[in-house]
Amino acid sequence: WEGLYAYTRSVHLSDKPLERINPRQGTPEPSDPGIDRTPKLFIGGKQTRADSGYSYPIFSRDGKQMGLVGQGNRKDIRNAVEAANSARSWAKSTAHLRAQILYYLGENLSIRADEFARRISEMTGQDSKESKEEVKLSIERLFTYAGWADKYDGAVHGAPIRGVALAMKEPVGTIGIICPDALPLLGLISLIAPALSMGNTCVVVPSEPFPLSATDLYQVFETSDLPSGVVNLVTARHGEVIESLSGHMDLDAVWYFGSSGLSATVEKLS
């Protein structure tokens, strides 16, 4: 927690526990066998099929199918961690470059702000005003952490010998992130932006009931000069991948926002 708060610079924290949001139910629509619309994950800078070959539908509040997302599994998590570890040169990039890319992400997201807001409203049932505010805050978070990229500076301390001690803040490394169910776009952006700002790479499992905001971000990542492997998104049922992610020995940290039951699992395995 100390490391997470240092990154996000949280000021006002709620004591209210997060509650699980169950995925909405509906009637799946038949697919067109003549068109390949296989849902993809985002690993290593590319849209890739889930290893399982399976997908699951996402429904709106009124039971209408909005789309399909790939059902990631343990192998997809492993591939995503490998891709993130292969992109550790991100930590050696200049703070100015990281800031530029975060600004670029914010600018590209702002171009599609109305589209993202409509998608969030349809998925979650929020009214248009709330969804537009969520997108607006997401863009502001990207700009905020772009500004912080060159301000995670070190400090000079006195030493009991003739000389000084220079303390430098360094990236944690590869961070596994399991996003909260609510606020599907803002929750994801609020977690990856500070991690990227400091030079970390990420393996992200987005909101389980509302993952389409994350899959819509694939194109934003692809057009924002983000190096391959820096952000990897694996859509999945949280309960099916949480052990694989939090227990992975090649991760340096795990950030989890969700139910207290799964929180205990994450803490035990990590």
Predicted segment positions?
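Conserved NAD(P)+-binding/catalytic subdomain of aldehyde/semialdehyde dehydrogenases
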Residues: W1-G3, K169-I178, S224-S270
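C-terminal segments
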Residues: W1-G34, K129, K136, E140-A155, ...
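N-terminal glycine-rich, Lys/His-bearing helix-loop that initiates the first secondary-structure elements
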Residues: H12-Q65
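A generic structural motif
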Residues: A50, Y54-S55, G70-N73, P209
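Glycine-rich loop-to-alpha-helix module at the N-terminal edge of alpha/beta enzyme cores
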Residues: G63-Y152
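Short beta->alpha linker loops
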Residues: G72, M123, E133-L137, E208-L212, ...
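Conserved small-residue-rich beta-alpha loop and adjacent elements
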Residues: G147, K151-P227
